[in-house]
């Protein structure tokens, strides 16, 4: 098989096929994204939901890579409470690293001069992720069982096969990444094409396979960065990784098909298939739309209030006193985000001493929180209520092994 050494071998970089379908999906996504951001009125509730989505993002990114970590394990890891089981502890470390890098990435994107397509940015994501992992997780193995050390932030320095695809010669990676940056980061690309650009860039970066390991994580983080940069991340209220994990087989099949060469004279003019790249972009945008619509339905306020009520009616049966009153306070916090302690009397109709008991009960249960002993009460979404407030947010999907490279 020929070894790719010139960036022209990854043409086309944008598909010409299925233009009408991609335009239709773009319009639908922009409309759905606007509806989603209007679902949450309280800035504090928005932040709390975004925190849950960030945990969900690492949960699904881990699943795509063949690692399963429960939401409660992630919550414990955030409190530095690690499992004694080595595999579970490693998965917790992977989750922590992902969450930390995503937060860092969001902060860095506040600087408009940061080029999300730049090789330096990609290497930064890779370095920040791996430097947060313990030394045993700095090793990977090929499908032949050969172990090799992962160098944080360093481009691949060996040849590799990924499935049926042989990525470019490692010596040519700087040239490929420079072409990737200059084309996709071109300021002259119309905003109406940006979603297709994000989808196509996702595949072409996977095709380049710039790192020895960790490519999938970096590529998904970079796609998330692009959505944030172009105002399409819904203030952190949805994540692409949930859809990609849900349709993992379709995702990998679409990636692999788009690796294929041109299929005849009617399939574009580049080295690779235009039609297959268009199919991947359609899949990618359909996944985006599905996830935005899913979260929009989940955050519909009347429906969310009902799920809060049902949690207290059917799940919090261990609460023998003040369950109804605690439900009213919690429901109000889901609406408003924050209330004063004095409001509890008004909401429950109880005396001050009883209201104090209700507040203590809610704090002990974790259904709301406070910044200080006498501070206001704030909405909280601990892991134990995720499946009740946000059903199907964390799908119990089977763990499948990732595609390993051969060297």
PLM regions and their residue ranges:
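FIC/Doc superfamily catalytic core
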Residues: 1-407
